[in-house]
Amino acid sequence: MIYIFGSGLAGLSAAISLHKSGYKVTIISKKINGGSSYWAKGGIAAAVGNDDSPELHKIDTLEVGDGLCDSKTVDYVTREIRYVVSTVEKWGFKFDDDLRLEGGHSKRRILHKTDDTGREITNFLLNLAKKKGINLIEDKLLALKVKDGKVAGFITEKGGSFDAEKVVLATGGYGYLFKFTSNPSTNIGDGIAIAFKAGALVSDTEFVQFHPTVTTFDGQAYLLTETLRGEGAILVNERNERFVFKYDSRGELAPRDVLSRAIYDQYKKGHTVYIDLSPIEDFDRKFPILSNYVKRYGKRLQVFPGVHYTIGGIRVNTRGESNIKGLYAIGEVTDTGLHGANRLASNSLAEDLVYGVNLVRYIDNWEGLSIDDVKEVIEVRLRNSSNRLSLEEIREYNWNYLGIVRNGEGLDKLVKIYESNDTFNDNASLVSLLSAKGALLRTESRGAHYREDYPNKSWEDGKRIYFMVSRN
């Protein structure tokens, strides 16, 4: 039996692929239909157009990743996604015929299903998993059992203790640890914290991606997909100034980190920022879901950057293998090196599918993550304390000190807060500590990580920060 924790795109695609090859699979998830995949609006980046190629997709990914992408991983994903997309289509999923353009991409390569791709494909895979008879259980992972560097099992809240030689973590990221986010409340980094406490290597936790255009409908955060700007939507302030070209010559199609800081700067200067959807031709047909909201709210919507994706996580190789034998990790819970310092739009669902569908190739042929080339690992001591912050306090702290623009004074304060907190029992505090500590240590600005006291890129390309739990 192979146990997969998480029922988003990565977990479901892995389960179906394994099941089709004859493996017994059980999916365990805090909420079967509650992950981030449902909220992905744009689509899946794949070089399937006649004027496109994996090499061009790779170039765009490396450019946006700002010197921190793992070239081998980028090669793997940009090449394999075309095969994986055809596999999912053979399973019965149908993408819309047209390819769309998003920020940072040099070609139209975004495969989509209406303007709600994440929900459409995740629902399809969930229904397929149910039809295949794959066991789906709602439960919460509490701990991994590891013996002599190998997975021995796990403990869940309801089910108790289980023995297992192979565990797949697909539990998502930690975006809900910030006050303003497009992520669901399940995304608090549990999988990362549990793996870390078990001895897994964790990296790149300082890189938190803010999506530039989040709005609110009916009091709820709503992601306004990158595709809107690819189809002609523009950003303006209350003076109707199209301000983005002051910050980047690519305008509305600049990478997310650039636009997020530009919008943040506009608000800091006293302006209000809107996205104007009126230039989009045939809007109702292209964006039928959003169109329902626009009929009530209009085509000029106030926007603000919100946390959308967390780049750091469990360090894995291109096979989804961690440094603990038998522990695989796929999806946003990982740090594969694909995204570098900043994720290219619609590469996350591509990564989910490539690592999920292809896991079957490696499940019986363990190689493990090689850490021989890791020059320095920072050990972090866990604290068992009665001092415990509420989740809302953590979200407020992270938004204030670990947000779009950071500085050493705020980060140092934040690290000290979490170091005095219960990081042994509280996963949210532990992951927040790793993120804040990474941001404090990275004394430069790169990609999604911006330090106003170190505004320039100064570290050598490829240098990343690794954490491991201290056993002393």
UniProtKB/Swiss-Prot annotation:
Any note on cofactor binding?
A: Binds 1 FAD per subunit.
InterPro entries (alphabetical)? FAD-dep_OxRdtase_2_FAD-bd, FAD/NAD-bd_sf, Fum_R/Succ_DH_flav-like_C_sf, Fum_Rdtase/Succ_DH_flav-like_C, NadB, Succ_DH/fumarate_Rdtase_cat_sf
* Keywords, in A-Z order: Cytoplasm, FAD, Flavoprotein, Nucleotide-binding, Oxidoreductase, Pyridine nucleotide biosynthesis
User: Per the annotation, which location comes first and is thus the protein's main one?
Assistant: cytoplasm
Read off the Pfam families from this record.
FAD_binding_2 (PF00890), Succ_DH_flav_C (PF02910)
| UniProt binding sites for FAD | 7-10, 36-43, 190, 332, 348-349
**One cellular component term from this protein's GO annotations in UniProt:** cytoplasm
Identify the enzyme class: oxidoreductase
Localization of this protein: Cytoplasm
The biological pathway it contributes to is: Cofactor biosynthesis; NAD(+) biosynthesis; iminoaspartate from L-aspartate (oxidase route): step 1/1
One GO process term, biological-process aspect: NAD biosynthetic process
From what superkingdom does this record's organism come? Answer: Archaea
Instruction: Name the Enzyme Commission number(s) assigned to this protein.
Output: 1.4.3.16
Q: SUPFAM superfamilies attached here? A: FAD/NAD(P)-binding domain, Succinate dehydrogenase/fumarate reductase flavoprotein C-terminal domain, Succinate dehydrogenase/fumarate reductase flavoprotein, catalytic domain
User: What residues make up the catalytic site?
Assistant: R256 (proton donor/acceptor)
Q: Could you say which residues are annotated as the site Important in orienting the L-aspartate substrate?
A: E102
Name any cofactors this protein relies on.
FAD
Known function? Catalyzes the oxidation of L-aspartate to iminoaspartate, the first step in the de novo biosynthesis of NAD(+).
Family assignment? Belongs to the FAD-dependent oxidoreductase 2 family. NadB subfamily.
- Give the protein's recorded name: L-aspartate oxidase
Q: Which gene encodes it?
A: nadB
